[in-house]
Structures are given as structure tokens and as C-alpha cells.
A protein has these predicted regions:
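Bacterial extracytoplasmic/cell-wall-associated proteins, especially those involved in peptidoglycan
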Residues: 3-129
Length: 129
């Protein structure tokens, strides 16, 4: 018996799920406004660097929680992330973080953020230019 490897030819769905996994891992899908803000920031980074959002979420220096693969794809929270990313990829998600390209949780204070003012605070996540 021989098995044939079936390739997924739907690259858009693959990209959406990769980005949604990072959004879910970083935000915990705490709320829709937070998921929208984080997704907007990913789009801002991609636009500012001239790369795709999939390449952005692969950057381990930006996204520390990206290695968590314990996401249940059927969960309501993860599906919220998928829908939000899909909206962003189609250009239907407004930038709710005013061009921000950096973030951290309010309970943390990385060195780079000490002398900067944040431009958006969404559910305890701070966004910076």
C-alpha cells in the first residue's frame, strides 16, 4: 500500500492560521478589542518592514509566546482570532493602534519602553510606535 502526500494548496488559510496562532498565544484571546489591536499591530509591522504578516509572526525577537502549539483550533477564542486575522488580511480591519509596531503587557516594563510613551492601551497591553 502506498500513501500519497496531500499538499494544502490554500496558502491564504495556512497564513491566516499561522498568524492567528501567534495572536492567540500572545493575547490569550482576552477580548475582541485586544485581538483586533494586536492583529493591527502585526499589519503595521509588515507594512513598515515591507514584508508579509506571516514573516512578521515568525520573528522570535518580537513574539516570545509563539512556540505554544497547544491551541485547540475548534475553541471559540481561537476562532475569534482566525476571523479577525482573516478580516485584516482582506483589508477590512481598521488600525486601532494608530500605527503602533511595538507592544508589551502593562505588568512588564522592558528596557526599550522606559523612556517612551505608549499610544494605545487595550485591555492591559500597551502599544508603541
Amino acid at each position: 500500500m502506498q500513501f500519497e502526500l496531500i499538499q494544502n494548496t490554500d496558502t491564504e488559510s495556512t497564513a491566516v492560521y499561522k498568524i492567528a496562532r501567534v495572536v492567540y498565544n500572545e493575547t490569550g484571546a482576552k477580548s475582541l478589542p485586544l485581538v483586533e489591536a494586536f492583529t493591527s499591530m502585526i499589519k503595521n509591522i509588515a507594512r513598515s518592514r515591507g514584508i508579509s504578516p506571516v514573516d512578521v509572526v515568525g520573528d522570535k525577537q518580537i513574539f516570545m509566546a509563539r512556540d505554544n502549539n497547544d491551541v485547540c483550533a475548534a475553541s471559540r477564542e481561537f476562532q475569534m482570532c482566525v476571523r479577525t486575522v482573516r478580516r485584516a488580511m482582506r483589508g477590512n480591519l481598521p488600525d486601532s493602534v494608530f500605527g503602533a509596531t511595538r507592544f508589551h503587557w502593562a505588568c512588564d516594563m522592558p528596557d526599550w519602553a522606559v523612556a517612551r510613551g505608549y499610544i494605545a492601551d487595550v485591555d492591559g497591553m500597551l502599544f508603541y510606535l
